[in-house]
């Protein structure tokens, strides 16, 4: 079952990306390194509700 998730920047706390994940394969919260247009650089983005 795929569910929608939001990815938030860990530095500025803004929610920049919307994605989906498979809860069966990834039960934990996802952390990805993505570009934050507000910070102007690549930062770690964590899954939020």
Curated annotation (Swiss-Prot):
InterPro entries (alphabetical): Ribosomal_bL33, Ribosomal_bL33_CS, Ribosomal_bL33_sf, Ribosomal_zn-bd
Cited SUPFAM superfamilies: Zn-binding ribosomal proteins
Keyword Membrane (UniProt): no
GO terms of biological process kind: translation
Superkingdom of the source species: Bacteria
Any one GO CC term of the record: cytoplasm
Keyword list, A-Z: Ribonucleoprotein, Ribosomal protein
GO molecular function terms listed in the Swiss-Prot or TrEMBL record: structural constituent of ribosome
Pfam families (UniProt xref): Ribosomal_L33
Record family assignment: Belongs to the bacterial ribosomal protein bL33 family.
Protein name (Swiss-Prot/TrEMBL): Large ribosomal subunit protein bL33
């Amino acid at each position: 079952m795929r569910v929608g998730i939001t990815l938030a920047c860990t530095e500025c706390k803004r929610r920049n990306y919307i994605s989906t994940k498979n809860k069966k394969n990834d039960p934990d919260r996802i952390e990805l390194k993505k570009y934050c247009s507000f910070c102007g650089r690549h930062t770690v983005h964590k899954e939020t509700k």
